[in-house]
Amino acid sequence: MLPFPNKKYGIIYADPPWQYKENWGNGQVGYETMKVKDICKLPVSDISMDQSHLYLWVTNPFLAEGLEVCKSWGFNYKTLITWIKTYKNGQPEMGMGYYFRGCTEHVIFGVKGKMKCKNKITRNMFYAINSRKHSQKPNCVREMITKSSGDIPRIELFAREEIQGWDCWGNDTKKFNKPYIQDSFQWNTC
């Protein structure tokens, strides 16, 4: 495992490489995956400040496991933020699924200590076109995080691109590097 930074952060943003029991489509996700027990063992509580926020990506089948990770890292679950993936025409995407075709991913929001959000008007859902590479998340999420939690020390775990203002940790931190392009997204357009 790569060494963790010797620094404390007020924002932990993570997109773990969940290990699915089955492979879909071509069968390969293109990166190394981890078992939930190994994700839980990461020393995230050691790098998080006493007052901090966690933003943890999970897919629908891994919601329970995500809550387990949240707790093991020292955070108390508070709510979910939902990404509704859409096609360019605005219609929900037709994704994969064990029982239903998923068009959503979620961010588990957890709190360590009693840290409040700075921006109380941010909604807990957003629409964004999913025209990016597998596992690449919309840039607008990082913007929402800094608006909600503040301009404080922050790290992205399992990062796949370097973003100015963020420390990053992972074995694939330059995978999606390119000039920053503003995503086409809308917040809660229902």
Tell where the protein language model's regions lie, with residue ranges.
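Class I S-adenosyl-L-methionine-dependent methyltransferase catalytic core
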Residues: M1-C190
